[in-house]
Design a protein with these regions (language model features):
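Short helix-coil boundary/hinge micro-motifs
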Residues: 1-163
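Cys/His-clustered metal-coordination modules, chiefly Zn-binding fingers
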Residues: 129-207
Length: 207
């Protein structure tokens, strides 16, 4: 007798920024020492669990499952990181006004085809949410909300507002929702102030 392996999760619609937040889990990409937030599968699951739209899917990949299926767990993690890098390159192309590379476009489309399907809307405390059928033991299924976010960003008007931080060592991606469309920094308190301090140093230490 066969059993249905799929379960249903209730997931809110992901913000378009979610995919960029995922890409930004590797920080200081332009520096000599990039900072990796997702060094292990538990790191990935912990990050997903902190995202309201992905928490339910992250809970399906447990430590016990990873111990029982170590090769699948390693493959899932490697595929997730590869998807992160494809999303980052797509974002960088948008920020630069370039065409998204066909390899990255194909990788995103292939992952979307394997993502947990949205079966319809349900009512929840916030109003409405997606009913998602999932068996999240693949990177595409696990990252479904991130992938939907990336697809919505590429297909929507906000693709023209994707920027990369003007700090060449940072390279974080963000959607510029400022009225003037002139935001330069991922965070003014961090990269913006650092750039101001560097300019001040150069002005006051000219030989």
């Amino acid at each position: 007798m066969s059993t249905n392996q799929h379960r249903t999760a209730v997931i809110g619609a992901p913000a378009e920024d979610l995919c960029l937040d995922f890409a930004n889990t590797l920080s200081w990409r332009g520096s000599a020492t990039p900072s990796e937030s997702l060094a292990t599968l538990p790191d990935l699951l912990s990050w997903l669990a902190r995202q309201a739209q992905a928490e339910a899917l992250a809970a399906t990949v447990t430590a016990a499952w990873a111990e029982r299926h170590p090769k699948r767990a390693v493959r899932l993690f490697a595929e997730a990181i590869a998807l992160r890098e494809a999303v980052f390159r797509c974002g960088m192309a948008l920020a630069s006004g370039d065409i998204v590379a066909e390899t990255d476009f194909a990788a995103l489309n292939q992952a979307l085809a394997g993502a947990s399907p949205r079966r319809g809307l349900v009512r929840d405390a916030a109003g409405f949410a997606w009913a998602v059928e999932h068996e999240a033991h693949s990177a595409a299924a696990l990252l479904a909300p991130v992938l939907w976010s990336a697809a919505d960003l590429l297909a929507g008007a906000d693709r023209l507002r994707v920027r990369r931080c003007a700090n060449d060592e940072c390279l974080w991606l963000f959607v510029d929702r400022s009225k003037t469309g002139s935001r330069r920094w991922c965070d003014m308190a961090a990269c913006g102030n650092r750039a101001k301090a560097q300019r001040h140093y150069r002005r006051t230490h000219v030989s």
